[in-house]
């Protein structure tokens, strides 16, 4: 029944170095899996109390009401159609419903195709945004490493000019990756990124990663400022007959621990910037991770990467099957 979850979905690079990474993902999402194991393993009949407990587990895992209701409706339908009565039998029913959940998540699992993009977009400009503390600057360092692993040259733009620590942190990531960082103390964010793009063109760099200052979606003046940054980026690298204007990718970085607040962040930043992809960070901590299912239903924007640690290799492409297996603790069933 769970054979579809046992398949190894890692790419060859992940197979070499990903075992510990996948283990950290499972560990970070273990709370939900252990709760489900306890619910199904204690025996008893399938009744309204059992469904209510399952609903609570899913909601507290940040799956959200909409996605939870859809999953439970499918589960109840399956139980009726197959005349199931024992709690332990819900594993089979849940596996059936997971197949539908995978269909929901699979369209979101769209890896960043930078190698293909630079054939017509060079430099390929990636703008990163998000609230304070989501892990933007750290994600840029990891993303630089990931892109270098694909044989691409990278330049970093220190567009978070509000925090000196952000420039220093980006410089540190640049040193660790042997990547040039363009920064100005007290400079204008748009000007810094503009200069970085010009520098990348002169050096024939493949990819520019542009950091921006963290901001709350409710801070209207700061949201207007980041719109200006995007407009300036478009002026630095305007549309051509073969390429759209930069930025070619707008990545929103989300802290997995923010739960349902992530939905409002996605909505606000997408309205302001036209978000093309998401990075979900900090899945190695207390994150419950079900918010991805909620995002899939409310704002189906591709999840490009998920992160589970501080190491350079701890940012990986999102694989729906691996994620759902780890989230629901069913990979070993």
Where is each model-derived feature located?
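P-loop/Walker A NTP-binding module and the surrounding RecA-like catalytic core of P-loop NTPases
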Residues: 99, 108-333
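Non-catalytic terminal/linker segments enriched in charged/polar, low-complexity residues
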Residues: 1-127, 149, 154-155, 176, ...
